[in-house]
Amino acid sequence: MSDVQERLHILLDYWIEHNSEHEKEFRDWAEKAASLSTEAAQLLQKAATKMVAVGNDLMKAREALTKEMEGH
């Protein structure tokens, strides 16, 4: 395994966890914002949903890297 592969694997694990934390935080704040601004709450929920999609792509990238590492 190259240094770049090893570093990327570590970063992907970190980014996946970090992204998940942000998604949860956005949803928490959307609930709090609901009484202040429906639009703000909806936009925070929308951002959280996008974070889920980002997380899915990060997991797919990690899986692809893992497959590549196992293949060599």
Give residue ranges: language-model regions.
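N-terminal acidic leader/helix
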Residues: 2-30
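Short acidic DE-rich linear segments
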Residues: 69-72
